[in-house]
Regions:
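A conserved catalytic-core segment of Leloir-type glycosyltransferases
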Residues: 1-51
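A short helix/loop element that forms part of the nucleotide-sugar donor recognition site in Leloir-type
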Residues: 151-164
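Nucleotide-activated donor-binding/catalytic signature segment of Leloir-type glycosyltransferases, i.e.
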Residues: 210, 219-246
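Aromatic "clamp/platform" in nucleotide-sugar-dependent glycosyltransferases that forms part
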Residues: 266
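Conserved acidic donor-binding segment of nucleotide-sugar-dependent glycosyltransferases
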Residues: 298-299, 303-310, 319-324
Length: 364
């Protein structure tokens, strides 16, 4: 195992070999969970380490946690982040449909975990409605944001740092390039906006961060190809730029350079991009789905719009882009709102949960 020791006092990452040393599809990783569990057991035995509690993330790690719980006889808490049944319900393409093995695995995790952490009350409702979960075993603790990394940067400084040609009013999308993320609707909204903007008005543009925009005959990213085709179809070459992936350390500059950040997803269990943007003092326009409906406060930190409604999305984006006073007001309110999600606050809630689970009452 490869061990990293640079995460601060009491923290380290241990890389456990499991499966072949080749790139695997997500659905193939499941087969190697037994190898992963065995590697963890051998590592702890060889190092003489006794763990008190397991905190697993995402469903496959939850399956591993069940096996480790059996071997070590210790409690575990789990956070799903996304749910298979929800992804099935909103899937736009066949490849986005989750296998039944995932859903049965999630149910198994629900039956074994000492506590389930949900990001929002929306996720609690989904666990009850779709999985018949015991909500007495579920606690809401949202993900946190690093306020030392994501904070407001003066717009001119941010635009100078990112060194990409940006327009006077810049919209920003950050995330994976897949149908579930709703980028097709965003391009439709941009096309509507282009028709509404007067020639003499300050122009706007959309910057898309994520994926690989360099298409070749061997490209397997069909969604990126589809979106670039739509950009041409709608004559948006001067309005939309696909930048590809960017280093995490540069994201605060992109967020701060933007007039608004757009999250047009069909499903988000939480919406980390929205939280990072708000921490940088940038208002967010997001779909009214899942965690986004709780995270983005309509008319206060940004706007929420019905999913699959490009016209409503265009209307809200236009309002933010061309009402400077409103944009500044919502941006300041967004930064203030995001402070409650700082890791200092969230970490305390997680530590309190650990103490509860480790106590006698928590293990009953």
């Amino acid at each position: 195992p490869h061990i990293l020791h640079d995460l601060g006092y009491g923290n380290r990452v241990v890389h456990i070999p499991a499966g072949p040393d080749i790139h695997l599809k997500k659905e193939d990783l499941y087969k190697f969970i037994p190898d992963y569990v065995q590697g963890i057991l051998e590592f702890s035995k060889n190092k003489g380490i006794r763990y008190d509690l397991i905190h697993s993330h995402y469903w496959m790690s939850g399956i591993a946690a069940i096996e480790l719980q059996k071997s070590w006889n210790i409690p575990f808490v789990h956070m799903f982040h996304t749910l298979g049944v929800m992804k099935q319900r909103v899937a736009r393409e066949n490849e986005e449909i989750e296998g039944e093995y995932r859903i049965s695995g999630e149910k198994e995790v629900l039956n074994h975990a000492n506590r389930i952490i949900a990001a929002t009350q929306a996720e609690v409702a989904q666990l009850l409605w779709l999985y018949q979960a015991d909500t007495n075993n579920v606690v809401v603790i949202p993900p946190g944001v690093d306020l030392c990394h994501f904070y407001p940067i003066p717009s001119d400084e941010a635009k100078e740092f990112i060194k990409v040609p940006v327009c006077n009013r810049m919209l920003l999308y950050v995330g994976r390039i897949e149908p579930l993320k709703g980028l097709e609707n965003l391009l439709k909204a941009i096309a509507i906006m282009r028709e509404q903007v007067q020639v003499e008005a300050p122009q706007f543009c959309l910057i898309v961060i994520g994926g690989n925009p360099d298409l070749t005959p061997q490209t397997t990213d069909t969604e990126m190809a589809h979106l670039q085709s739509l950009r041409e179809q709608y004559h948006l070459q001067d309005f939309v730029a696909f930048l590809g992936q960017r280093d995490q350390n540069t994201l605060p500059y992109y967020y701060s350079a933007a007039s608004a950040v757009v999250v047009p997803s069909h499903y988000e269990s939480f919406g980390m991009v929205a939280l990072e943007a708000m921490a940088c003092g940038t208002p967010v326009v997001a779909s009214q789905v899942g965690g986004l409906a709780f995270l983005v406060q309509d008319g206060i930190t940004g706007f929420t719009v019905p999913v699959d409604d490009p016209q409503a999305l265009a209307d809200r984006l236009m309002k933010l882009l061309y009402d400077d006073d409103l944009r500044e007001k919502l941006g300041k309110q967004a930064a203030a709102f995001a402070k409650q999600y700082g890791w200092k606050n969230i970490a305390k809630k997680i530590i309190d949960l650990y103490r509860t689970v480790l106590s006698k009452d928590g293990n009953e």
